[in-house]
Amino acid sequence: MAYSPSLNDIKSILNKYTSKDYELKCENRYDGKLELWLKGVFEEIVKTPGTRYVTHKQLDEKLKNFVTKTEFKEFQTVVMESFAVQNQNIDAQGEQIKELQVEQKAQGKTLQLILEALQGINKRLDNLESK
């Protein structure tokens, strides 16, 4: 036997999926089935949350704002070229830093030698003063 919803079931379904802007009429038929009438504007009766139809003209207008594949490829090459230039700059700066570190080490060794020489002179002066 097929499922036959009651009038309350039908009303609860209509309340769930439709707005309140309609007139509902329901009668029992001679064969025991329900006859149901809805009177109202279809778009106002049926709720369509999130459902929106777009015409081709509207779609074309929207698509004008999107980037084409060739434009995207051009943009991508420009970005990749700028990344390559930045990478070269970073490599050059890294080499400069290495050179400066080597120079700094050499200066540190020179300063150490100067310090040792000054300490040697200081010891000699102390020896001369003590005599």
From Swiss-Prot:
Protein name: UPF0134 protein MPN_010
A Pfam family: DUF16
Family: Belongs to the UPF0134 family.
